[in-house]
């Protein structure tokens, strides 16, 4: 079964806001699952507040990014661009350990797979894109999230090292299905 997520690219003064995930200590755009009774836009605004502490105004629909294959269920992420309109930067215990703005030309290398394309699209004012992101991993190497966290905790590596060694090495094939630069 596929899931749906709302992702937010908060852009302010030539910088983009990223969060560092607690589970693998890599950077990504804020966002998360759409809850029952909630629209995609409402989910984006809620997730921005929960994960960053900011109140945001959505300014543009960047696109839809469909992650297929990989370890868990397929996920369709809808990316909105936004601007901050209130609040203050904070982390969300259990989900984020750091929140920071990055200059467009100084993005962190340690990013969650697939988010590089999303960040670049948001920065370049892309609108209306549909991207299929295929994560190719061996069929026998698809542990559940719980099993993956256990492997991480038993590995002797830092959370980031585990992610970079095990997950980020998977091949990601990105296919622009609609729109683009």
Model-derived segments and spans:
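A generic structural micro-feature
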Residues: 2, 72-74, 93-96
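A structural signal for short, well-ordered beta-strand segments
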Residues: 8, 61, 80-82
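A short coil-to-beta-strand element that immediately follows conserved catalytic motifs
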Residues: 54-63
């Amino acid at each position: 079964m596929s899931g749906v997520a709302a992702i937010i690219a908060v852009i302010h003064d030539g910088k983009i806001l990223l969060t560092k995930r607690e589970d693998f200590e890599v950077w990504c755009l804020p966002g998360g699952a759409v809850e029952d009774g909630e629209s995609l836009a409402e989910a984006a605004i809620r997730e921005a507040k929960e994960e960053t502490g900011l109140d945001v105004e959505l300014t543009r629909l960047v696109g839809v990014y469909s992650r297929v294959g990989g370890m868990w269920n397929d996920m369709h992420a809808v990316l909105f661009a936004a601007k901050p309109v209130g609040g203050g930067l904070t982390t969300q215990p259990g989900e984020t350990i750091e929140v920071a703005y990055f200059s467009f030309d100084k993005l962190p290398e340690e990013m969650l797979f697939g988010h590089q394309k999303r960040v670049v699209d948001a920065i370049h004012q892309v609108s209306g894109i549909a991207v299929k992101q295929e994560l190719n991993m061996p069929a026998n190497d698809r542990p559940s999230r719980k099993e993956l966290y256990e492997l991480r905790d038993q590995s002797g590596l830092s959370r980031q090292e585990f992610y970079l060694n095990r997950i980020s090495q998977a091949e990601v094939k990105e296919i622009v299905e609609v729109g683009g630069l």
